Every structure is written in C-alpha cells, then in structure tokens.
Amino acid sequence: MKLQNFKFHGSGLERFFGPLEARIMNALWDAPDELTIKEVQQTLNRDKEMSFNTVMTVMNRLVDKGILSKKSVSKSYRYRPVLSRDAFLEAQSKELTFELVQEFGSRAVAHMVDALEQVDPDLLDQLERHLKQLKKER
C-alpha cells in the first residue's frame, strides 16, 4: 500500500490522515461491522457536530484512495476499511522505513538504532535477534 501523506509533526493517525479522516477511520475500525455514512456521522456527532454531506464526501474520497471499500446493501452503502488498523499501520510503517532507508541510507539506519536505544532498549535487543535470524536465513 502506498504511503499516505505522512506528517512528522502530527500524532497517531493524523500523521497519515487529516483530522476528520482520522476520526472516520477510528469510527470504522472501532465498529464491529460495516457502517453507513449515517452511522459514522452519528458516531462522530458524539464529539463534534458534523454534516452528513461532509462525512459522505470524506468517506467517498477515502474509497477513491483505496482506504475504504463500500458495498450496496438495500438502499444505502456500507463502508469498511480495506485493512485492519494493525495491518494499515504495519504497511505504512514498512513503507515509511523503506523510503527513509532508500533516501538516506546508512544515516537513517544509524538514527533508527540510536532512537531504539533512547526510547526502549528492549527494542534494540529485539532488533539484534531479528538481524541474527535474517543472517541465518541467508
């Protein structure tokens, strides 16, 4: 999956989506089943009033981007994310890492290792085990 417009200064899903897109995606990921636009609107309205047309426009743009799928049921459409939240974040982090390494090479790798040490030394141990496994598989 192509990397969404990543924003370094955002947080959470807003690194990949606009604020309303992120709220819509969270509503759909948190739902046990597919939702209609009206159901998403009702979920969003708990926090902030949103017009039906605004929600519909954003959801259809997410369909156009390949993030959501929709299917016709009775007289309405039901929407769902193409990927689970975990699968989406996995794909995006993989693509981001690939692009950083492709663009910045060993500098990016060195900074990632430094970040692992600062943020969570256990992650550095996991990386070391992963590297050993990759070397065995060669």
Q: Which sequence ranges carry the predicted segments?
A:
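Amphipathic alpha-helical dimerization/coiled-coil segments
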Residues: 93-133
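Short alpha-helical segments that sit at the start of domains
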Residues: 1-26
